Amino acid sequence: MPKMKTKTAAAKRVRLTATGKVMHAGSGMRHNLEHKSARKRRALKRDDVLQTAQAKKMKGLLG
């Protein structure tokens, strides 16, 4: 049986931590930043942990 391929679209969007959590960058930091406060922009910059059900699906896509 051939090796399982990684879904590169998923690999570009998430990363795994050493403990196995799946991290993703939030939305809202691409454009229209001039009306957002510095506090809001700092909060949006942080990476978030995916929810359990979504993380399970992502790990399947990553192989």
Curated annotation (Swiss-Prot):
SUPFAM superfamilies: L35p-like (SSF143034)
Similarity comment: family membership: Belongs to the bacterial ribosomal protein bL35 family.
Gene3D superfamilies (alphabetical): 4.10.410.60
PROSITE patterns associated with the record: RIBOSOMAL_L35
Organism whose genome encodes this protein: Bifidobacterium animalis subsp. lactis (strain AD011)
Residue segments, region Disordered: 26-50
GO-annotated biological processes: translation
UniProt entry keywords in alphabetical sequence: Ribonucleoprotein, Ribosomal protein
Coiled-coil parts of chain: none
GO molecular function annotation: structural constituent of ribosome
A GO CC annotation given for this chain: ribonucleoprotein complex
One protein family per Pfam: Ribosomal_L35p
Name by which UniProt lists this protein: Large ribosomal subunit protein bL35
Source taxonomy: Bacteria, Bacillati, Actinomycetota, Actinomycetes, Bifidobacteriales
Source domain of life: Bacteria
